[in-house]
A protein has these predicted regions:
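Carbohydrate-binding surfaces of carbohydrate-active enzymes
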Residues: 1-170, 175-191, 196-204
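Short, surface-exposed ligand- or partner-binding patches at beta-edge/loop junctions that are enriched
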Residues: 116-128, 209-225
């Protein structure tokens, strides 16, 4: 919990895997495939994370750090529409306290929206230290069920580099919680169940015995619509 970090000195995940092939609340299935929750938990356990929380009409931006020294960095908050156009961009030099949760900034909802519809906008919150991105999170003004999500069109190119296979993914419009899969194959993607923001390209490693050509021909996507 970003507000009560000092109360929690360890985390227990229940449960990680299954001993039989059924639908369940485990974060990996019987065949060791990662479910969405497992990707999320991996990212939540990074050494430094940013998180956002709506407090009425105010957006509070937090950083949670496990480091034992203070971090000096830059907080970048960008509001985008679902076509990838920048609505507003704010930047601020910040200090992240050691081994605790820190409120970095608070912003008003209306100032972020700039007159746009909250059902058609998203926030990208990024914490940088020099040229290194410590963490980046996406946030929304309303629940996903209330978003006016567009119909995206994907570009997916499979390739191989230094013996590692990958896919390069982009979209013309926002695609939420995109799941990559290949039917009938035991395959691992380094990232999955992610938001694809228009104007960006995502390189995702693919652990499989399939060739890039086979990946290209057989890969499928699902997303929230």
């Amino acid at each position: 919990n970003i507000n009560t970090f000092y109360l929690y000195h360890f985390k227990l995940i229940w449960q990680i895997n299954d001993c039989w092939p059924v639908a369940s609340w485990s974060t990996t299935d019987y065949y060791h495939k990662w479910k969405a929750a497992h990707y999320v938990m991996r990212d939540c356990f990074k050494e430094v994370i940013v998180a956002s929380k709506w407090e009425g009409d105010t957006l509070a931006i937090y950083a949670v750090s496990d480091r034992l020294e203070e971090i000096q960095g830059e907080l970048i908050i960008e509001v985008l529409d679902f076509q990838g156009n920048s609505v507003s961009l704010v930047e601020k030099e910040v200090n992240v306290a050691a081994n605790t949760s820190t409120v970095l900034w608070k912003l008003n909802r209306e100032s972020l929206l700039g007159g746009g519809s909250e059902k058609e906008m998203m926030l990208v919150v990024c914490l940088r230290q020099g040229d290194r991105v410590l963490d980046e999170k996406n946030a929304y003004f309303v629940y996903h069920k209330n978003l006016n999500l567009p119909e995206p069109h994907f570009s997916i190119q499979a390739g191989e580099e230094n013996g590692e296979k990958f896919i390069q993914v982009s979209s013309d419009k926002l695609a939420c919680n995109v799941m990559f899969y290949i039917p009938g194959e035991s395959i691992f993607f380094s990232d999955n169940y992610i938001d694809i923001i228009p104007g960006r390209s995502y390189k995702i490693k693919v652990d499989t015995d399939l060739s890039p050509t086979q990946i290209q021909e057989r890969i499928g996507v699902r997303y929230v619509r």
